[in-house]
Amino acid sequence: METTPYGNFPKNFLPSATFVLYKTDPEELIYPVNRQILLIAVLSGLILPSASGDLFPNSGPVASSKSARLRWGQAAAPQAAPVPVKRAIWAANQLQSKPYRYGGGHKSFKDHSYDCSGTVSYALAAAGLVSSPMSSTEFRRYGERGPGRWITIYAREGHTFAVIAGLRLDTTPFDRYTGRWAPRWYPAYRPPYGFDARHPIGL
């Protein structure tokens, strides 16, 4: 037998290895790759996308308007909005029945309760815009400075909320005298005094 460099074999798969070319019948092994490694690679490709898909919805209500519309507590995404914006809205709809808890949604996107930055993190994760939950302090440095066309995150020490396609995703009713603290959509404007406005690049 003769040893041949891996050549066109993917460099990110066993990069320091060489494969062995056996001069045998076609039915016999040509690339003696560890079966356990192959199994892990295949399962990773199948299971991980499925888990992500189960956590965040791929569809939801839409509206023909240019901005999101609130219907019985659920937001309908603008038909013309980019897919990431729609997915952020549909994901945030799932949190409307969740209670508020300080630190909620930070150990994992999937939680029983959420705080302000955990709520915003969840919506952005569904859109593929964050890879892990972020705190209010971290959101002050997120993306680019200023309001976005579709998504704007308002962050300061201790609180974060977002405006997505014209609706405010917040955990406080703002006036602090009515309602209760919980992830909710609000049509009412909240003055951003003291907040840093940030937005995802391109949105």
Label for each model-derived stretch:
Residues 3-7, 14-16:
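Cationic, amphipathic, low-complexity segments that mediate targeting or membrane/lipid association
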Residues 11-12, 24:
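Polybasic, lysine-rich low-complexity intrinsically disordered segments
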Residues 2, 31-34:
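N-terminal hydrophobic targeting signals that begin at the initiator methionine
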Residues 34-100, 175-203:
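Intrinsically disordered, low-complexity
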